[in-house]
Amino acid sequence: MKKIFLILTLISLTLLSCGSDEDSLQKIDQLFNLYIKDSSGNDLLKPTEIGSYTGVSFTDQLAEKDNVNVSYNRKMLADSTYYLEYLAGATRQFVEETSDGGKIYKSEIRVSLTKKISDTQNAPVVQDKLEIFYRSSPNVFEVSRVLYNNQLVFTKVPDQPNVATIIK
């Protein structure tokens, strides 16, 4: 009887020590949405419309091999506005440690845009640079800021979506 009690006590203690609380989980916030519009506010990501960027590709500039494609999704809102949704996939390079013990990483992506100028012709491909900086701490891994062609287009605001609009 003592052996059974001892075994049950050990099993109970083992199970209790393996439990974790919600506070120990790291929040992941790395979804980034990119809108591209002209100076009048017109959507330039409509996939079939003349004057829009009908061809888009993302290429990882920090990958060990050349021309490594990075996946993204072209999505549409209820009002028919298109945007590019990027979740992950590009190489993350360590940049620095922060004063609070966190770490900063970055991904560098070449964004190739092909504009449809007529039913049968496309303009030359435009190649832009997208840099996404991430902040990592024990509590959170999140997009902290984004540069597009070396211009700051996004800075993280707590509990807000990661969204930037580029004017071309």
Q: What residue spans do the PLM features occupy?
A:
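Positively charged n-region of N-terminal signal peptides that target proteins for export
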Residues: 1-4
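Glycine-rich, aromatic-bearing surface loops/beta-hairpins
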Residues: 119-168
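C-terminal motif of bacterial Sec signal peptides marking the signal peptidase cleavage site
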Residues: 14-17
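Bacterial signal peptide processing site
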Residues: 19-22
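Tryptophan-paired
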Residues: 52-116
